[in-house]
């Protein structure tokens, strides 16, 4: 007698077979996930009276959830994520009182949360991210869902204040309400969630950043705090005492990006000794990059682009411990909810899978790059573009042998491109465009495999992939390099022979 049918992770096409339960009323598990099935969820599914698990995620299913699905009184897992399903969620979904996991993310569902959902009192995981759900979230009563550990309602159209009833879900470990239209302030009642480790409220309309920090720093279990796209045009609180020595004691990821915050990098960040990932991109932060960042023993990703930061690249930044010797200190625990790259939409389930990164692009930084940069041997991504850096590109950059992305474009670098950069064998994204570089692009290396756009805007550069030919004249120990452009214009530079 058939009790389980698992067809997951294949390449099946067509409709999900509607005969699944006609002759198999004792079936307990149906798994059609990760295939290419299309069409609607078959009617007749409600005849599977013993069914506990129904999975059909990552297919091409469309249409509404079939109405008879609420007859599955024993259902514990309903997983239909990553399809093209639409319509409203079943109004009587509360009849699925044994439901543990409801995963309907990445579809096109509309309408409000069904009030009957509060009857799913065994619900453990609720993920409805990336739909078109709407309504005043503050009016939904979460208090009966006391077994919830994960709630993800991100990327929908909910509005209103943060629902106070959420704070009755004492088992809650992860909460994502990002990319909605929520407003108001973070309430102190959130401190009732003693197990809360993951909090993402990005891209809403929250206010009072100072209040938010004062409250959240006391949430002892927090490891991930994502609050970017809120607190628009407020001042980053710089008071050294705002975060005590025990504040944010377990925090690993902190994001306040895309908020147009003013002020400087606050010194209280130096107390976050478990911080691994800090992003403050797209603000109006001024002042210099503080040397105390190097005292954060686990920091491996620093995003400060699109600000008003001035000064030089601090030598102290080259002493970040996790970028020098080992990423052993970086947390390798599975994240309670995945992190998504907003550009690539790449999904990260582990912090250790994220690139070791320093991004300082689009600021007012100046001066030369310190030779100490060669100490950051584990760096994967370095972006210093659109600043006012000058001087030569240091040879020591060739010691960054893990580099996959190096962007030095739109600065005032001069001299030649160091031939030693050819040792950066993992480099797949490179640009020195719009500087004052001259001389030949190192030949016989992968540096010549990049597009012309990686070198444009340097009148003195020559050699492939540029069309400008290289030539040189030797006068004793002095070499004159020149680039003969297609236009016939002569661009001359010089260097000493070795």
Can you say where each PLM-predicted feature lies in the sequence?
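Plant-biased, solvent-exposed loop and capping regions
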Residues: 1-498
